A protein has these predicted regions:
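Extracellular/cell-surface secretome signature
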Residues: 171-197
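Conserved functional hotspot residues at active sites or interaction interfaces
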Residues: 1-145, 149-172, 196-346
Length: 346
């Protein structure tokens, strides 16, 4: 048994969902009383150069309606993804994609999962503990804004095998030059990737919040400052005509419609207000941020650490107590706590 406030680590065998695939790959975690659970991929960064972690949402809080948040694909073979997990038999999942997707296989039926283009919609039949993983198919593709609708509650994860933050590798399609310097010739983002993206990419993952849990008021707190790097924030709207403001002002944010999103960078702490429900993601910057990756690290760059994915919690869902794990094989560990003035924290 686990005592109140105690923390226990369980190492699970690998059950990779690699590429676009539908297969029975999920693990089930069940307890006799309510618990808090997290997953680390992997826990201590052993035998890999990249990892991330996610809070796991209990099945009674899952939903049927989601929008995906992740980062764009920045390498040929390291892709963005959305993962859907069924918790009941005969779950129908409809996916409206926002990016070109990789061809894959439905292991249950042996059928091919065909390539999709932005705006395409496809339905999938999942049984209990089936995993549907859909990945992007080209550099610059981003699954953010993909809509998930299901007839039963599902768990949805968004992430990337390895993505950058910030992105400094885009090709200006009109001028045919790389954005970061306005001079290097390009035809596509792939012409600006290897040399000009801010080092280094990292694995990203988060279990996403169903739309029914989104809020309209958030507090954004800069992650532990390593140097002059800025965090990247992404805001996605659930409804049309969503007006977003920040206090103090951080960026010019357009009116967002359903499934639309906006990115901006900030080194400050600030409030986010919206007229309709939004989801807010925070991405830690790479070790060579804030400068483009020209000659490696420059003065003022973070110098350590790479992108990680955090989902902000709306103010109305703040809690008074938390249990969390900091793995013991990292050079730096820190926790960020946001509280009202005069609050005691221990």
């Amino acid at each position: 048994p686990i005592l109140p406030g105690e923390l226990r680590v369980y190492n699970l065998p690998r059950r990779d969902a690699d590429g676009t695939v539908l297969a029975p790959l999920a693990y089930r975690v069940q307890s006799s009383i309510p618990i808090t659970a997290y997953q680390f991929n992997p826990l201590d960064n052993e035998d890999v150069f990249s990892n991330d972690a996610s809070l796991l949402i209990p099945s009674n809080v899952l939903g049927k309606y989601y929008f995906v948040m992740t980062r764009e694909q920045t390498f040929d073979d390291l892709r963005s993804f959305v993962t859907v997990v069924a918790v009941r038999d005969d779950t129908t999942v409809n996916v409206d994609v926002s990016a070109p997707t990789l061809v894959g296989t439905n292991v249950r039926t042996g059928e091919t999962i065909e390539h999709m283009e932005p705006g395409d919609s496809r339905s999938f039949h999942l049984m209990e503990y089936d995993v549907l993983n859909i990945e992007t198919d080209e550099i610059g593709s981003d699954m953010s804004g993909t809509m998930i609708l299901a007839n039963r509650n599902v768990a949805v994860f968004g992430g990337s095998e390895a993505s950058n933050a910030p992105n400094t590798n885009h090709c200006d399609k009109q001028l045919k030059v790389c954005e970061w310097d306005g001079e290097t010739p390009c035809e596509s983002n792939s012409d600006c990737t290897s040399k000009f993206n801010t080092c280094c990419a990292d694995h990203l993952e988060q279990q996403l919040f169903p739309v029914k849990t989104w809020g309209q008021h958030y507090l954004a707190s800069k992650a532990f400052p390593r140097n002059l790097e800025k965090d990247v924030y992404r805001i996605i709207a659930a409804e049309n005509n969503t007006v977003v403001t920040t206090l103090p002002p951080q960026a010019s944010i357009p009116v967002l419609n359903q499934g639309e999103w906006v990115d901006f960078e900030s080194i400050e702490n600030f409030e986010i207000h919206a007229t309709r429900p939004i989801m807010v993601g925070q991405f830690l910057a790479a070790q060579d941020a804030p400068g483009p990756n020209i000659d490696g690290a420059q003065e003022g760059d973070a110098g350590i650490g790479d992108p990680a994915f955090i989902l902000l919690v709306p103010n109305e869902q703040f809690r008074s107590d938390y249990v969390f794990l900091a793995p013991n094989r990292y050079e730096l560990d820190y926790v960020t706590v946001v509280v009202p003035d005069g609050t005691k924290v221990w």
